[in-house]
């Protein structure tokens, strides 16, 4: 395994260990501003077509986010990740992939889930944690 592919997998495994403290669940969590230093987000409220979560770390931290596996119905639903708020730059709309990792440029990252009405929702799980300055991973 090349070093370039080993790093995302190592990050995913270490993230899964770190996030046991704060799991975001329940339909009332959609639209929440999350200030936990680590946790996970999943689409537990499958009735909503559109949902956003904003992760806010301490001012001196960046947000590290990892999606171990994503298998949404492409063309019918997607997850979009923003560096900062919804008005910030988008990393793109994602519907499938594995070992997907993002690092914010500041202390905020926003996740948007969007689904075309009338289509069923696919499950997903996203891990996040705060990264201090100077740490590579």
From Swiss-Prot:
Positions of glycan attachment: 119
Gene3D superfamilies noted in UniProt: Spermadhesin, CUB domain
CDD domains on file: CUB
Disulfide bonds: 30-51, 74-95
Domain of life per record: Eukaryota
Expressing tissues: Seminal plasma or sperm.
Keyword hit for Signal: yes
Entry keywords, A to Z: Disulfide bond, Glycoprotein, Secreted, Signal
GO cellular component, one term: extracellular region
Signal peptide limits: 1-21
GO biological process, one term: single fertilization
UniProt xrefs under PROSITE patterns: CUB, SPERMADHESIN_1, SPERMADHESIN_2
Coiled coil: none
The name this protein goes by in its record: Major seminal plasma glycoprotein PSP-II
Lineage of the species this protein comes from: Eukaryota, Metazoa, Chordata, Craniata, Vertebrata
């Amino acid at each position: 395994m090349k070093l370039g592919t080993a790093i995302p997998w190592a990050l995913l495994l270490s993230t899964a260990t770190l996030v046991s403290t704060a799991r975001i669940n329940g339909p009332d969590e959609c639209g929440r501003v999350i200030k936990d230093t680590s946790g996970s987000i999943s689409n537990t409220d499958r009735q909503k077509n559109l949902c956003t979560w904003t992760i806010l770390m301490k001012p001196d931290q960046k947000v590290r986010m990892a999606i171990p596996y994503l298998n949404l119905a492409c063309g019918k639903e997607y997850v979009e990740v923003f560096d900062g708020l919804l008005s910030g730059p988008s990393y793109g709309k994602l519907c499938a992939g594995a070992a997907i990792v993002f690092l914010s440029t500041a202390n905020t990252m926003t996740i948007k889930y969007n689904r075309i009405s009338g289509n069923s929702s696919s499950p997903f799980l996203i891990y996040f944690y705060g990264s201090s300055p100077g740490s590579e991973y």
